[in-house]
């Protein structure tokens, strides 16, 4: 989806870093009149395609933040042997403020946000038959981007007072040059979540129930479920997950019968399990999971036996592990042009199970039935009601979603530990990039940096 042709049309309208060998706080000030740049419906559709391209940057939904989440949450179940200093620092929980991966994730996120702000500012020229869909897709992208930014660069919702803790800047208007107005302060965590939920609620109302591989009503409901779960709003998390499951099953989505088929090799299309995925082909897109997890590529991340030991005998998910050169790797990401799975249907069953269990409800179905849907697909014996505990639910989630980028956020939500570090350690939060603080004096740094 990362089409350079479309990106070029927007580069002059965004604040981007000129060159990695120049001062990193220097950004271009050239701009174009956004009203003349987006003066037809076709212009806006091209802009929206560019937003998906930037969302799929290697430093964003192309995978780097998800790989980093797994490394930052790593307590020994992964072995990092790579030469990238930036990921070594993340794996060691010793991130300097000038870590370029951290800086580029921030930049990529706000580039995508600026893209969709351009789109949203020009809705008046969009064909009436398309305007709701365009607005919904743009707001989905903005919400998704803000959600991952606030989870990485700020305290988690349950760490102190979200109304007092600094989150990330909320930018809702296009930025084409550096002005005092563009130097935005960090909004509070609670305000960032409120904006995310507002955008997703609007997107859910405006998007078609299915939309090819673009954002849809079902993907908005799925992301709503993820957001509500992360902020501990369990009734709404269960409800949103149930909506996504019900609408998904009624419109062609389904769990693959065999777990490994959710991660196909030599297939570039979405599976029926992909609620939302970034598209990767031989000519466009990024799949950083493949880069770092696959023995077919760099293979910098190997799976430790301590992780393998967590699976029960007969668990079909074990079939995706393989040995190469004396190390064990996951086969989830072996295909170079495999799509990046952002939200799978399986996660929604896990969200509904956890949320219902914590809320003491059975919205849509019981936690026991939902967990057993996952276990049955993995060729495991169903749990009994006596065996169902929060720990058993979280274990199924850990194994089902292993290495897909959920590890750090799951630990924080459930107040676990990362080795000797508590869940709310400042070392488990990204620093605000130093180049951004130099460029914007209104930004404050996180504690511990």
Regions found by a protein language model. Give the residues of each.
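Acidic, glycine-rich segments characteristic of secretory precursors and extracytoplasmic regions
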Residues: 20-69, 439-449
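Hydrophobic-face positions in mid-chain alpha helices that act as interaction patches
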Residues: 43-46, 61, 72-89, 197, ...
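Inward-facing hydrophobic residues that define packing positions of alpha-helical scaffold repeats
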Residues: 48, 113-116, 193, 200, ...
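Short coil/linker segments at helix-helix boundaries
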Residues: 152-194
